[in-house]
Each structure stands twice: as C-alpha cells, then as structure tokens.
Regions:
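Phosphate-binding and adjacent anionic-ligand microenvironments
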Residues: 1-156, 174-180, 184-202
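A generic beta-sheet turn/junction motif
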Residues: 159-161
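Short, well-ordered beta-strand elements
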Residues: 153-155, 164-170
Length: 202
C-alpha cells in the first residue's frame, strides 16, 4: 500500500521527480507533500481533467481512448476466490504452493517469459533459467507471470480475508476510436479465458 509508495518517495528525495502513485484499491497520491492516499488532491485533479476535456469538446473516455491509441490498450481485472474456514485456508496455501512450484508454461497461448516471486525476491528468466534478485524493501507472498505478448497475471492470498486474489492484465493495440468497443470486448474475452486456465471458479 501507500507506506511502500511513501518509502520509495523518501529514498528518492532530491534524486528524481515524483509523478504519482496508486494502488489497485483506487487510492491515489498526486503530490509529494502527502505521504498517504490523498483523495482531496486526486479528486481536484480529476475535476481539472474533466473541465479541460469539456473545454475541448471531449469527455474523459475520449481522453482515455486517445491515450490507448498513443501508448497501447491495457485492461486489468481482479478476481477473488473466497475459501472460508480451516479447509479454505489450507486450500489457499496449497494453491500458492502449486503455482510457485509448477508455474504455467504459457498463458492464453503466449509463452511465459518471466516469473517474479516476491516471497523469495527472485526473478526468473524462463528461457535461460537465469535469476536475479528483486530490489524490494520487504518480502510478500506474491507471484507474477509475464508472457511474450505482455500479459501479466499476479497471484496472492489476502492478508485480512479468506481469499486468494488474481489480477489479470492484458494488452492490445488500438488503431482508431471506432475499434475501442471491439478491442475492449476482445480483452474481456481473453481475461475470462485466462481465468479459466488458472482454474478460477467462484
């Protein structure tokens, strides 16, 4: 969460320019004079963006599509599996062990090229077997798989609830605004396919 964003800010004070930091639960930190999630600054920025867009005859979705066309389309979905009780906790432990010891060789037809294990702080190049240490301030029970087509799947148990969480991120190109809906639908279909590959069923 934000304690780690603030930690990186402290380490880089006077060395680099801070642009912004956020987490998957929608918190955002826009300025470096606050060291925690800052809804006041974030909503002020959103209002300014909306006003700028309106002045140009656009809306915020139009602006997002322009970004996708320039930098590439990206879509992420978080899926949580609830596994309650003692048997549920044991199942979550077993799933993490299985994913750690037997990582997928491909995801949605694209070969896995990199595996990051934030518990051992080791990044593995799947093709060469070469490993390197991840530069992180602490360990965490998180696994990440990256494929050749830039798909990323992250897996971790919740620290506060009886859940195992999956974050699936896919990428595509967007040539024109007219293709946005079709690209979005294609990304959603791919995410659902990946979820099935990982055995994610409610």
């Amino acid at each position: 969460g934000f304690k780690w964003i603030a930690n990186v800010m402290r380490e880089n004070e006077g060395k680099a320019r801070y642009l912004g930091g956020g987490e998957e639960s929608y918190g955002f930190l826009a300025e470096d004079f606050v060291r925690d999630k800052d809804s006041v600054s974030a909503i002020s920025l959103m209002a300014e963006i909306a006003a700028w867009a309106k002045d140009k005859g656009l809306n915020m979705t139009d602006m997002l599509i322009d970004i996708y066309m320039k930098y590439g389309f990206s879509r992420e979905k978080g899926i949580s599996l609830v596994r309650k009780g003692k048997s549920g906790a044991e199942e979550i432990i077993a799933l993490m062990k299985q994913f750690r010891e037997n990582p997928p060789k491909e995801i949605a037809g694209s070969p896995v090229v990199t595996v990051k294990d934030f518990q051992s702080l080791v990044e593995t190049n799947v093709a060469t077997g070469e490993t390197k240490k991840l530069d992180m301030p602490a360990t965490s029970n998180v696994l990440q798989y990256y494929t050749a087509d830039r798909t990323k799947v992250s897996v971790r148990p919740s620290g506060t609830e009886p859940k195992i969480k999956f974050y699936i991120e896919v990428h595509d190109t967007l040539a024109s605004a007219d293709e946005y809906k079709a690209t979005e639908a294609r990304a959603d279909e791919k995410i659902n396919r990946i979820a099935k590959e990982f055995g994610i069923t409610k």
